[in-house]
Amino acid sequence: MDARHQPWFLVFATFLLVSGLPAPEKFVKDIDGGIDQDIFDINQGLGLDLFEGDIKLEANGKNSIIGDHKRWPHTIPYVLEDSLEMNAKGVILNAFERYRLKTCIDFKPWSGEANYISVFKGSGCWSSVGNIHAGKQELSIGTNCDRIATVQHEFLHALGFWHEQSRADRDDYVIIVWDRIQPGKEHNFNIYNDSVSDSLNVPYDYTSVMHYSKTAFQNGTESTIVTRISEFEDVIGQRMDFSDYDLLKLNQLYNCTSSLSFMDSCDFELENICGMIQSSGDSADWQRVSQVLSGPESDHSKMGQCKDSGFFMHFNTSILNEGATAMLESRLLYPKRGFQCLEFYLYNSGSGNDQLNIYTREYTTGQQGGVLTLQRQIKEVPIGSWQLHYVTLQVTKKFRVVFEGLRGPGTSSGGLSIDDINLSETRCPHHIWHIQNFTQILGGQDTSVYSPPFYSSKGYAFQIYMDLRSSTNVGIYFHLISGANDDQLQWPCPWQQATMTLLDQNPDIRQRMFNQRSITTDPTMTSDNGSYFWDRPSKVGVTDVFPNGTQFSRGIGYGTTVFITRERLKSREFIKGDDIYILLTVEDISHLNSTSAVPDPVPTLAVHNACSEVVCQNGGICVVQDGRAECKCPAGEDWWYMGKRCEKRGSTRDTVIIAVSSTVTVFAVMLIITLVSVYCTRRKYRKKARANTAAMTLENQHAF
């Protein structure tokens, strides 16, 4: 049955927010057990003794510099092994989409390539660093590792990244408190010089997804890492998303000049309005402004916080007659994937009958003006705030996105405004949960917030529960609820992955750090009483009442009490204009449960590790350059090692002695040369003088 066929009470309740009704503790299941475990906590709890906590070293135990030979191709083959949990498989595929959106790195199912990444459920979360040319290169996403930022972290290792705090200039930015580190774990805080870990001339990054947290390997309750800038104390160790510097380094390392699935972003700060054009076939124009008397008072990008900046596009319907239109068209865009997601913010200060139409103008051979296709009509009641919208597109040819403002009937005191447009070749979220006046809700005591009811694409009704009762963390849970389609659906609910994303409202989608969590409905999972956890809500749930008085059944919630800390929630642009957005997607991932046919590997010769036969002395590190093993020798401020195997020691004192000796030697040689030259010259002139004297004597003799 179509998921949009909802009973009247759900339609009515869609716009309602239930708050102040705490869920019974026993009616939610916390997948984290109330503990926010980092990668290193998980691995240590399993008794793993990995290099730096989550790195699997090569067989010879050596660390080598990341050079061209350690890089992967831009499209990396992978296999999702059958051992992986279903939720982990879906999370990994979502992580790949983050790489595609922000880098030129792509991933494809393995089809026999010589080297590929095998992702499996091992013990803990770990990876090797770089392409080790082993054929099948393992990367473990074990129990509790199925968080998207954890997957991003481990794949960054596989792509060649070390941990941020191990770089050579680490001590300029953080202080390692050695006596707070667990005995025997001190080596996890080693520094590696530039010959091992290349910072690519990018500043130290407190916000890196590759940085240890302040509590890494602690032997008590106090921090093992103290940031020299105190404001970053609770920032290090974030596991939300790539930082800007993570992306800068990754794109430099792999020579990325553009992102794969990103298409366009526009906040209208520049006068060229991102290459957009005003159509000639309309009766009015969109205007670039910084405020409108009737609203909005500021743009959405900067919220009026920056003087002489903060612009948006406005269609003034108050001065136009009914039926007037204004069309704003994007620059030409060239799709590659066949599906796109358009995102923008809309502010209506005009009439409730004013309308925004979203078109695509697709160009084909022989059609100069393109084919105009209506994608969405948006008509909303003016509520005095910016509203987020998503529009799914499916364009396969060269196209433009067209924003058409239409003056409707009735009185208007303002018009339509748009801002912060993003277009990418990604999937749009299925639903948006918009929570207004959030700081007031967040400041309340014993507060819980329920979302409106939603439907998945398969027809399952669900609701999200946000737990705000903790003074330190915010929790989030997914509930199945009774809906119009329950008689036609399969129960227990099989393999639906619910992804809940707290939106970072940065104007540019590439610079956002999303906070996201996914859970999957396992039809075999049981509750403590033996009933199926994801069975029909009317069978295993409890009865509740919507604000309009209509009863419904709510199943057990599944999620986490440590979705995000309150401190992180107040960072970035999660809360903007006192609004937050939770993006919701529920998709069927049952196809990931089947075993894919695995091709036979391409026959290859075993890769010879040239460093296996080279022993570098005095702490030197073996590297492979152009297929040859070389020793990179350590050096200090006034000393260094040199030689084929770093067997010779040098120092500035030796250099001074050599320089002085060389100078004296050169001076002595030059002096000798000068003396010899003078001697030879004088001897030459003496001979010439004697010859002249003899000639004069002979002439005198002939005269007589």
UniProtKB/Swiss-Prot annotation:
The chain crosses the membrane at residues 655-678. GO terms for molecular function: identical protein binding; metalloendopeptidase activity; zinc ion binding. Keywords: Cell membrane, Disulfide bond, EGF-like domain, Glycoprotein, Hydrolase, Inflammatory response, Membrane, Metal-binding, Metalloprotease, Phosphoprotein, Protease, Secreted, Signal, Transmembrane, Transmembrane helix, Zinc, Zymogen. Its cofactor is Zn(2+). Residues 1-20 form the signal peptide. It is a single-pass type I membrane protein. GO terms for biological process: inflammatory response; proteolysis. Pfam families: Astacin, MAM, MATH_2. Proteolytically activated by trypsin in the intestinal lumen and kallikrein-related peptidases in other tissues. N-glycosylated; contains high mannose and/or complex biantennary structures. Strongly inhibited by fetuin-A/AHSG. Inhibited by cysteine and by the metal ion chelators EDTA and 1,10-phenanthroline. The active site is at E154. The record marks R239 as: Mediates preference for acidic residues at subsite P1'. Residues 431-586 form the MATH domain. Induction: By retinoic acid. Residues 21-654 are extracellular. It is found in: Cell membrane; Secreted. The modification Phosphothreonine is found at T697. InterPro entries: ConA-like_dom_sf (IPR013320), EGF-like_dom (IPR000742), MAM_dom (IPR000998), MATH/TRAF_dom (IPR002083), Meprin (IPR008294), MetalloPept_cat_dom_sf (IPR024079), Peptidase_M12A (IPR001506), Peptidase_Metallo (IPR006026). Binds 1 zinc ion per subunit. Coiled coil: none annotated. Residues 607-647 form the EGF-like domain. Disulfide bonds join C104-C256, C125-C145, C266-C428, C611-C622, C616-C631, C633-C646. Membrane metallopeptidase that sheds many membrane-bound proteins. Exhibits a strong preference for acidic amino acids at the P1' position. Known substrates include: FGF19, VGFA, IL1B, IL18, procollagen I and III, E-cadherin, KLK7, gastrin, ADAM10, tenascin-C. The presence of several pro-inflammatory cytokine among substrates implicate MEP1B in inflammation. It is also involved in tissue remodeling due to its capability to degrade extracellular matrix components. This is Meprin A subunit beta.
